[in-house]
């Protein structure tokens, strides 16, 4: 799957789960399961409930996504 096939959406972290997984509430009201991307792990970027994030979702499984960016605020 290439980068142009992914869907990027904005959301807010609702809950932190084990194994670096998070429940993310998207702007459209849906709640998905998200994991941290490898670059965010390498740079030790911490994510807490309430943070605004950008999530990439595969068109094949719309219930899971990859957290690729944490907003500044």
UniProtKB/Swiss-Prot annotation:
**InterPro entries associated with the record:** NA-bd_OB-fold, RNA-binding_domain_S1_IF1, S1_domain, TIF_IF1
Cellular-component GO terms for this entry: cytosol
Q: Which UniProt keywords apply?
A: Cytoplasm, Initiation factor, Protein biosynthesis, RNA-binding, rRNA-binding
Q: Which residues form a coiled coil?
A: none
Q: Which spans are transmembrane here?
A: none
Name of a matching Pfam family? eIF-1a
UniProt-annotated location(s): Cytoplasm
GO MF annotation, one: ribosome binding
Q: Which residues form the S1-like domain?
A: 1-72
| SUPFAM superfamilies associated with the record | Nucleic acid-binding proteins (SSF50249)
Which cysteines pair up through disulfides? They are none
Task: Name the protein family.
Answer: Belongs to the IF-1 family.
Summarize the protein's role: One of the essential components for the initiation of protein synthesis. Stabilizes the binding of IF-2 and IF-3 on the 30S subunit to which N-formylmethionyl-tRNA(fMet) subsequently binds. Helps modulate mRNA selection, yielding the 30S pre-initiation complex (PIC). Upon addition of the 50S ribosomal subunit IF-1, IF-2 and IF-3 are released leaving the mature 70S translation initiation complex.
**Sorted alphabetically, which NCBIfam families does this protein's record hold?**
infA
Q: How does it assemble?
A: Component of the 30S ribosomal translation pre-initiation complex which assembles on the 30S ribosome in the order IF-2 and IF-3, IF-1 and N-formylmethionyl-tRNA(fMet); mRNA recruitment can occur at any time during PIC assembly.
Provide the protein name.
Translation initiation factor IF-1
Q: Which organism is it from?
A: Fusobacterium nucleatum subsp. nucleatum (strain ATCC 25586 / DSM 15643 / BCRC 10681 / CIP 101130 / JCM 8532 / KCTC 2640 / LMG 13131 / VPI 4355)
Q: Which gene encodes it?
A: infA
């Amino acid at each position: 799957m290439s980068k142009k096939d992914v869907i990027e959406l904005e959301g807010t972290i609702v809950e932190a789960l084990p194994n670096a997984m998070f429940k993310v509430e998207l702007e459209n009201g849906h709640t998905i399961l998200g994991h941290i991307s490898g670059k965010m792990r390498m740079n030790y970027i911490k994510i807490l409930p309430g943070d605004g994030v950008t999530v990439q979702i595969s068109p094949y499984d719309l219930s899971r996504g990859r957290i690729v960016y944490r907003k500044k605020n």
